[in-house]
Amino acid sequence: MNLLRLTLAGTPVEMGRQHGRQIKPLRPHLLAVIEQRIAELRQLGADNPAVVQSCLDFMAEADRPLLAYLAGLSEALTIEPRRLQLYTLSSYLRDLWRAQQTIPSASPPFVQEGCTVWAASGPATADGRPLLVKNRDYHADHLPLQILAHVAPADGYRYLSIGSAGSPEVFSSGINERGLAVADTHVLSRDIGPGLPRFSLMRELLTHHDSVASALDYLRSVPHMGAGTLMLADAGGTLALCESGHRRCGYVISHGETALVNTNHFETPALAGQWIEDEPPALRGNSLGRRRHVLTALQQGWGTVDLPWAQRLMAAHGSPQEALCR
């Protein structure tokens, strides 16, 4: 699939305007997606104005680059700023609503995003160089919106990112000019609250950090919104997984002695009990199954892992419980 390529440079508001101008052909589809998400929130009663405002108040203090970017984007697309903000927060608002349901089976199940991410380096790979790999399994209506952005911030490292038209610039994954790479997955979690969303954390990592060690120092110093994971790899081969929660986070670090794999549940003691599995019966267990599938493949392919190997693995279909490409 050919991704629409964006070129963004300057301040956050300037890059937001550039983003909006460069995706004008996608505007009708984007508007339809925005209206659908907002309608879903309204139907659930998940669009509580006080909750939305608490997030925006936090961002006004701690994440001004995000609000500036969205302001430029809404201006270029002539979308009412509040609607774009609500759309940007829609995943968090839906998760918060879901986490507050007392009886899991009393609420309708949602097909959760099925992204799979892994990283390997050193003795695991054919040439010793690090690999960070992701299958992006997101909303089907985002397929036409997928973008590859070349980003040159006014202050910071240049980077490439994969994301969605109409969303913040690092909405899925990226790598900067110093070789720091990051990719996220979503986890439906009870441990969520006002904080920095994953796309803002990834933006800051790519803009200002050049190693996993530096990235982890940053992640430990700021409040997280939660509800997901971040996989990190740097040019030196250090790997790390951050399981992101609002009240606590879990971390796993590897210097190449082990590969790291994450899907859509938590594994660390800090957060394992916060995961909510809420999928239709046919897909129950698929996050655990996908992780197990990749771990087994990496063990069997140890020392031979390279880009073609990774592409073959991530194209694997199979049963609903272990298919990596869905």
Where are these regions (language model features)?
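C-terminus-biased signal that marks the final domain/tail of proteins
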Residues: 1-114, 206-247, 257-326
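Short acidic-glycine loop/turn motifs at beta-strand connectors
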Residues: 121-127, 176-178, 233-237, 244-246, ...
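Internal mixed beta-strand/loop scaffold within catalytic domains of large alpha/beta enzymes
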Residues: 91-201
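Surface-exposed flexible segments
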Residues: 143-149, 242-249
